[in-house]
């Protein structure tokens, strides 16, 4: 059936005379005359196989117009026209037969390779005969055309194939995917290993397909992505996407602008997976039930209408590894195809304005669409010459030079073949199968290289006068014919019967080669031919032909001069090396039959060449025969001489006597040997005894040898054990030696490092020791200074206490004086009332010589307290000029003279100074380079002194503890002064020592780093 109504309207564009053409390809029409290539109907022979279409006209005579007008041309194809077979066997095979009437003209060709891969299907005749069989039918039946031509419908084909694939069982579907994946590894025709010239060739490959490295890389990347990032649902979805890719490829959905087809197929698969997903079903049903849109009763009532594969009760399982690998490969190649399409779209020029739909991937590797037109029309305008080269007209030659190279044309052809729609491929398969089935019976022996015989023509009637070719040689053509006595025309039958009655050997037909009567054609009748429909009655041979030339053989009846059939035959090339070298080969022999004159000239030349060759061979044979005759004569003379010299009787007698003597000597030697054998059979007793003694000696020697061997083995074992022990000891000694050597090297290295360090750091140590000694001396001096200051501070405290008592006494005296002054003022003042003083309010009398000014005196650098002046206090004890203990007192005198001993105590130096042990006092930490714990200047208790609060210490206790810790023996603390503790507790040094303490005096000691005790000063 037609796929659409447009088939009838556009049937002229769907007639592919040159075979199946890919989608979007334009087929060039043949504009030249078909008779130029030997085809009267204007149709070119296909160039896609070994088969060749052969047409002969049905008309035999120009006078019989009725027969020629009603005749039809029947053609059949005979494959297996193998060029290599024809060249290797040195002969071609052409079998055919033709009817004797005008109903049918049939021919079969099998032999030398003519134009376009087979024997040319030429329907040429002699120039005076009209070619009436070349008429074409002006009208085309749409139904008949639709039954042979299938229109490409990518969308329908792709969707139909996808639906078909989704319904297949898993096992069959896996097999389909495996077959489809194996197609990507099949090398296309014309594939060759070429170098990569650009980035596009990486995706394209040398023959229009992706290269093997690209396929492996894409498969590996997709397999890694499949295993790492895809869950079970995604894997099953990708598995069905592989079905989509198979359907798109087989249905031609990837050709042209069919993005809608791809999106539709992917959408169908996605919707199916979403509907089948258990999670989505639970979500939708739960949402409907929660929103009260659908009731549970309604769902339970109509749930049986849902297909069982949509009602999932358990989650999906992961696909098998085989299906996963196939899906990964198919999807990887789909991604590669998408990349190739995009890159080809960028490389291809702007599309034409006529709106033709072109497959970008099918056009990969070509610049324009002219390549496809040239490739499809190449078989129309070109033909193969005698030497196997392609011969084209001048116009097509110029156009071919402007097209792409042969590599890109081959790549484009492979792309078109790979992008062929599925239904077109089925149609091509059907045509090929039917054609092979029709001719399988006739080609079963030809395919094995055997000649076809008359027994192979089963089912063909030969009783109506047929002629067929049996063998084609380089210079001869052999043929056979049936019986011409039984024909349909009664008049012709009467003529043949009359001729047979007159002479049985009369030839019923003759042969014309290229329109000329061929005199060297011989026709003989088969003797004793049995009666039958398929019996050979006539055999003939056309000789005198030139090799590698085209001939038109016409078989004409002898009585009516009517053509029985016309056959175009091309003789194969000569296989004889001498003949090939002697015959000049024309530069470009044409396949068209020559004229009669040219044919005769070529035959004459060929005959002369053969005659010359035969003469040369004859001369050579004569020379060879002469040499052989001379050799034979020499041998004959030798034999004659030997015969003549061998006739003497004396020589014969001497020879016979010599032979008799030889016979007697041989008999005597034989008898002696027999006697020796008899003696050897009877062994003497002496020899037996000697043999037994020798045997016993041999056994003893053998035992000694065995004992020696055992001793040797044991000795070897002992020596081996000793050697192994010695080797083990040697190995252990070597190991110890290696360890000692390693240790020695390490010690040497350490020694060298120490020596170098000592050499470099000797001065540094001396300098550090000197600095340490200097620091210790400074610390000792500072400690002595501190002791002196502590003593002065304690004395100042005592003086301050005495001064405080004195001040209290002065304050009491001042208060008493103030009271007296107030009483005096009351006495000296006026009375409080006009009447006078009240009783009891009389003031006291003024004390003579007492005035407040006498009580208060102000001296410079003193502070006044209620009119009293006090001397200024001393500054910090860290000042360079410390106050002496016996300094004169500067306090003012009071009315009451203080004791004399108080005048020797100055004011306290702590009056206007801060605490010496507050947070403002900083110290320097011990250096990290000084790692000696015994040479530290400060104890562990003093390290965090700046991190503590102010010392609340009693200075007297500090002084006592310091003196006790200094190591002075026999010195008791001052009972007047309280002991003062100090945080400066010097640690015992291994190389230094100090001491202090005496009653009323101070002492200090210091020592060098090499001293063992302190010295007192």
From Swiss-Prot:
Low complexity compositional bias, start-end: 58-75, 1007-1017
Polar residues composition-biased segments: 30-54
Residue ranges of coiled coil: 604-783
Membrane topology listed for this record: Multi-pass membrane protein
This protein's record includes keyword Phosphoprotein: no
Cellular location(s): Membrane
Gene Ontology terms: cellular component: membrane
Biased composition (Gly residues): 992-1006
Claim: Iron-sulfur is one of the keywords in the record: no
Region (Disordered): 1-92, 106-138, 339-368, 575-599, 830-857, 877-907, 964-1017
Role according to the record: Component of the regulatory network controlling carbon source utilization through ubiquitination and deubiquitination involving creA, creB, creC, creD and acrB. Involved in resistance to acriflavine, and required for normal growth on a range of sole carbon sources, including fructose, cellobiose, raffinose, and starch, and reduced utilization of amino acids, including GABA and beta-alanine, as sole carbon and nitrogen sources.
Family: Belongs to the acrB family.
Protein's name according to its UniProt entry: Probable ubiquitination network signaling protein acrB
Organism: Aspergillus niger (strain ATCC MYA-4892 / CBS 513.88 / FGSC A1513)
Classification lineage: Eukaryota, Fungi, Dikarya, Ascomycota, Pezizomycotina
Gene (UniProt): acrB
């Amino acid at each position: 059936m037609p796929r659409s109504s447009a088939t009838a309207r556009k049937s002229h564009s769907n007639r592919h005379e040159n075979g199946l053409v890919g989608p979007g390809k334009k087929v060039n029409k043949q504009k030249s005359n078909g008779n130029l290539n030997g085809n009267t109907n204007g149709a070119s022979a296909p160039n896609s196989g070994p088969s060749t279409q052969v047409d002969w006209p049905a008309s035999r005579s120009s006078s019989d117009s009725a027969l020629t007008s009603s005749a039809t041309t029947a053609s059949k194809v005979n494959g297996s026209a193998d060029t290599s077979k024809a060249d290797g066997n040195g002969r071609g095979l052409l079998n055919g037969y033709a009817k004797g009437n005008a109903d049918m003209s049939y021919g079969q060709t099998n032999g030398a390779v003519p134009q376009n891969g087979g024997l040319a299907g030429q329907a040429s005749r002699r120039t005076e005969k009209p070619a009436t069989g070349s008429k074409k039918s002006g009208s085309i039946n749409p139904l008949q055309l639709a039954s042979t031509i299938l229109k490409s419908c990518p969308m329908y084909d792709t969707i139909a194939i996808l639906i078909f694939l989704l319904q297949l069982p898993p096992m069959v579907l896996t097999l389909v995917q495996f077959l489809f994946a194996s197609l990507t590894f099949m090398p296309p025709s014309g594939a060759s290993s070429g170098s990569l010239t650009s980035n596009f060739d990486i995706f394209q490959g040398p023959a229009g397909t992706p290269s093997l490295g690209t396929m492996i890389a894409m498969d590996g990347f997709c397999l890694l992505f499949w295993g790492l990032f895809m869950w079970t649902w995604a894997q099953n979805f990708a598995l069905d996407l592989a079905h989509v890719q198979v359907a798109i490829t087989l249905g031609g959905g990837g050709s042209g602008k069919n993005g809608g087809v791809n999106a539709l197929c992917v959408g169908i698969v996605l919707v199916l997976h979403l509907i089948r997903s258990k999670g989505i079903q639970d979500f939708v049903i739960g949402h409907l039930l929660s929103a009260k849109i659908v009731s549970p009763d309604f769902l339970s009532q109509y749930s049986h209408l849902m297909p069982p594969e949509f009602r999932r009760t358990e989650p999906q399982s992961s696909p098998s590894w085989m299906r996963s690998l196939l899906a990964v490969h198919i999807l990887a190649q789909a991604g590669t195809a998408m990349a190739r399409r995009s890159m080809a779209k960028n490389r291809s020029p702007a599309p034409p304005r006529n709106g033709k739909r072109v497959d970008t991937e099918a056009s990969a590797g070509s610049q324009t669409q002219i390549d496809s037109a040239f490739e499809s029309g190449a078989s129309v305008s070109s033909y193969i010459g005698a030497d196997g080269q392609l011969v084209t007209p001048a116009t097509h030659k110029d156009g071919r030079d402007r097209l792409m190279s042969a590599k890109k044309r081959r790549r484009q052809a492979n792309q078109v073949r790979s992008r062929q729609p599925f239904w077109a491929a089925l149609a091509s398969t059907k045509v090929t199968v039917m054609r092979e089935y029709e001719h399988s019976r006739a080609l079963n022996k030809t395919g094995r290289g055997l000649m076809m015989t008359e027994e192979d023509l089963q089912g063909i009637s030969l009783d109506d006068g047929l002629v067929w070719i049996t063998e084609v040689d380089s210079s001869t053509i052999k043929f056979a014919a049936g019986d011409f006595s039984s024909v349909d025309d009664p008049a012709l039958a009467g003529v043949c019967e009359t001729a047979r009655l007159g002479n049985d050997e009369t030839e019923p037909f003759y042969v014309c080669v290229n329109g000329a009567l061929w005199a060297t054609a011989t026709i003989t009748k088969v003797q004793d031919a049995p009666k039958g429909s398929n019996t050979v009655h006539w055999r003939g041979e056309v000789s005198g032909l030139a090799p590698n030339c085209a001939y038109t053989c016409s078989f004409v009846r002898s009585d009516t001069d009517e053509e029985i059939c016309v056959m175009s035959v091309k003789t194969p090339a000569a296989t004889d090396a001498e003949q090939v070298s002697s015959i000049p080969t024309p530069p470009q022999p044409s396949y068209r039959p020559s004229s009669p004159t040219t044919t005769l000239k070529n035959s004459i030349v060929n005959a002369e060449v053969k005659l010359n060759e035969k003469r040369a061979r004859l001369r050579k044979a004569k020379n060879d025969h002469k040499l052989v005759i001379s050799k034979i004569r020499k041998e004959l003379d030798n034999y004659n001489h030997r015969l003549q010299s061998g006739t003497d009787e004396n020589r014969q007698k001497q020879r016979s006597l010599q032979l008799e003597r030889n016979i007697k000597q041989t008999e005597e030697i034989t008898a002696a040997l027999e006697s020796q054998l008899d003696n050897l059979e009877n062994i003497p007793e002496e020899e037996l005894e000697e043999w037994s003694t020798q045997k016993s000696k041999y056994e003893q020697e053998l035992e000694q040898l065995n004992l020696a061997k055992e001793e040797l083995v044991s000795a070897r074992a002992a020596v081996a054990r000793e050697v192994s022990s010695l080797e083990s000891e040697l190995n252990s000694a070597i190991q110890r030696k290696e360890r000692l050597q390693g240790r020695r090297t390490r010690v040497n290295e350490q020694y060298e490092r120490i020596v170098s360090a000592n050499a470099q750091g000797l001065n540094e140590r001396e300098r550090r020791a000197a600095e340490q000694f200097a620091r210790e001396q400074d610390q000792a001096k500072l400690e002595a200074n501190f002791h002196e200051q502590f003593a002065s501070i304690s004395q100042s405290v005592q003086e301050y206490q005495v001064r405080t008592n004195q001040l209290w006494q002065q304050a009491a005296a001042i208060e008493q004086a103030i009271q007296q002054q107030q009483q005096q003022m009351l006495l000296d003042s006026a009375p409080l009332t006009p009447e006078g003083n009240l009783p009891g309010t009389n003031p006291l009398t003024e004390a003579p010589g007492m005035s407040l000014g006498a009580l208060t005196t102000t001296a410079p650098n003193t502070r006044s307290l209620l009119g009293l002046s006090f001397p200024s206090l001393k500054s910090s004890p860290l000042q360079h000029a410390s106050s002496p203990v016996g300094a004169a007192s500067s306090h003012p005198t009071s009315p009451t003279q203080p004791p004399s001993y108080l005048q020797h105590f100055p004011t306290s130096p702590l009056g206007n100074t801060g605490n010496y042990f507050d947070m403002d006092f900083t110290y320097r930490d011990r250096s990290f380079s000084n790692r000696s714990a015994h040479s530290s200047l400060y104890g562990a208790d003093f390290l965090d002194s700046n991190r503590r609060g102010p010392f609340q210490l009693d200075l007297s206790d500090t002084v006592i503890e310091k003196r006790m810790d200094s190591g002075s023996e026999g010195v008791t603390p001052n009972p007047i002064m309280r002991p003062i503790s100090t945080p400066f507790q010097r640690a015992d040094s291994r190389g230094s020592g100090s001491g202090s303490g005496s009653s009323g005096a101070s002492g200090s000691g210091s020592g060098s780093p090499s001293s063992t005790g302190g010295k007192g000063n």
